[in-house]
Amino acid sequence: MPESKLNSPLRYHGIYNAPHRAFLRSVGLTDGEINKPLVAVATAWSEAGPCNFHTLSLAHVAKEGAKEGGLTPLAFPTIVVNDNIGMGTEGMRYSLVSRDLIADMVEAQFNAHAFDALIGIGGCDKTTPGILMAMARLNVPSIYIYGGSAEPGFYLGRRLTIEDVHEAIGAFIAGKIDEHELYEIEKRAHPTVGTCSGMFTANTMGSMSEALGMALPGSASPTATSSRRIMYVRETGKAVSRLLENGVKSRDILTFEAFENAIAVLMAMGGSTNAVLHLLAIAYEAGVKLTLDDFNRISKRTPYIGSLKPGGDYVMADLDEVGGVPLVMKKLLDAGLLNGDVLTVTGKTMKQNLQEYRIPNVPHNHIVKDVKNPIKPRGGIVILKGSLAPEGAVIKVAATNVTKFEGKAKVYNSEEQAFKGIQSNEVKDGEVVVIRYEGPKGGPGMPEMLRVTAAIVGAGLSNVAMVTDGRFSGATRGPMVGHVAPEAMVGGPIAIVEDGDVIVIDVENERLDIKLSDAEIKRRLNNWSPPEPRYKSGLLAKYASLVAQSSMGAVTRPVIK
């Protein structure tokens, strides 16, 4: 990229920029280093949990790679909110909020210090989408590297993930296991640094970074403890110099076709429903018009082929051994289900990347099926619409075999109320648990309901469904419908559901309905008034005033009159 198009010369070159250069010298930069393009290494790092515990060391490796590529790298941090530690508490309300905060923080630090290019490193659920949103917003040469998943745990010969700990609580409540066994599962479920090992939200979004073309091929699947993780981080540092040299910016890669590819990979792998929110949000920042209808359109034509937890039997480390995300993408490309002509961070097309990537010559059909012999003929996520969700709702069909469910509503106005209801055996087989006022504005922050869904599964309530305007963890399984829009707080129909109302979940017809006449729904809505907001000051109150509905990715938007 010509110097005239770089940001850093305007800030650091020339006699009048001597004060700015003085501060770069203070951190050890030489004249030669100041005269090179400056690359930001945005790193989501935190000791509060294993997901991003190791990313600071990865940042040092990425910087080494960038230096080898002739650049001057400087690292800065972003915040991290650990979803698992916040699960079922007020802390979870900050999870989705942190995604947009991360995007804002990266934008602020990048522009304030006049960087020329961006390397992003993150490990958990919101760090990947937050950094990708910033890359899309900034539209500068950018590349992402995922921090990697943890190795799976083991207990009595059974492979464990964090999902098993949550479900063990439900089993304990139901008297199926004792406190000692719960404790043993807790100690063994997550034995190393890295993200949750199943195809939960973190690994889903790591996979999306590859599928979008924003990360090096094969870089999502090695575990956080793998030496190949270090190799990919170093190569990522080198690769950003080629993007700068060729003038390739993030929006050159983040096209509508790239998002179609990402959705296809999401559907094929049975990834997290949270990816729907995050892809919509990244597209919004990239100026790409992506809608929920695009997800259903691609879901219908894309088979579900990845047997990965929670819907299947395997974890990310297993997928890595047989070829990682490129194995899935190559199968889709060969079947005509991917656009191979899109540009990627390698400077090559997706098709060229997949042709050059060496898939291990080992059996893989137990993990990744053939497109012509899939686990299910349509993708792992379905968008539902109907009288209960006029703007849409999301169900992960990869994690349930239920295609139609009809039952009476058991209504709760918060996740906490619902969890207490399950503890006290209020919920009966055949019912639909409705949890409302947990949407983007109502939560606020659209918290995940894993504590409730895991308690339902763990308690053996196999014939219970759930509908919420909140979110689900990527570890959730069962007939669980989330992201109901409009949410209760803004007067969506979910606000007027009463105990005993009949709710119908119909996956085949993509419907979510309440068995009430239009006149009765209208009458109830006319008599409805919103509750007092849970927060009237602070970050959560500010967020609630700016956030859009889940059908729009729950992005925060400025209020411009």
UniProtKB/Swiss-Prot annotation:
Gene Ontology biological-process annotations: isoleucine biosynthetic process; L-valine biosynthetic process
Keywords, sorted A to Z: 2Fe-2S, Amino-acid biosynthesis, Branched-chain amino acid biosynthesis, Iron, Iron-sulfur, Lyase, Magnesium, Metal-binding
Binding site for Mg(2+): D83, D125, K126, E448
One Pfam family linked to the record: ILVD_EDD_N
E.C. numbers: 4.2.1.9
GO molecular function: 2 iron, 2 sulfur cluster binding; dihydroxy-acid dehydratase activity; magnesium ion binding
Reactions it catalyzes: (2R)-2,3-dihydroxy-3-methylbutanoate = 3-methyl-2-oxobutanoate + H2O; (2R,3R)-2,3-dihydroxy-3-methylpentanoate = (S)-3-methyl-2-oxopentanoate + H2O
Active site (record annotation): S473 (proton acceptor)
Cofactor note: Binds 1 [2Fe-2S] cluster per subunit. This cluster acts as a Lewis acid cofactor.
Residue numbers of N6-carboxylysine PTMs: K126
Pathway as given in its UniProt record: Amino-acid biosynthesis; L-isoleucine biosynthesis; L-isoleucine from 2-oxobutanoate: step 3/4; Amino-acid biosynthesis; L-valine biosynthesis; L-valine from pyruvate: step 3/4
Protein residues bound to [2Fe-2S] cluster: C51, C124, C196
Keyword Iron-sulfur carried by entry: yes
Cofactor dependence: [2Fe-2S] cluster; Mg(2+)
Keyword Lyase among UniProt keywords: yes
Role noted for this protein: Functions in the biosynthesis of branched-chain amino acids. Catalyzes the dehydration of (2R,3R)-2,3-dihydroxy-3-methylpentanoate (2,3-dihydroxy-3-methylvalerate) into 2-oxo-3-methylpentanoate (2-oxo-3-methylvalerate) and of (2R)-2,3-dihydroxy-3-methylbutanoate (2,3-dihydroxyisovalerate) into 2-oxo-3-methylbutanoate (2-oxoisovalerate), the penultimate precursor to L-isoleucine and L-valine, respectively.
Assembly with partners or alone: Homodimer.
UniProt record similarity statement: Belongs to the IlvD/Edd family.
Protein name: Dihydroxy-acid dehydratase
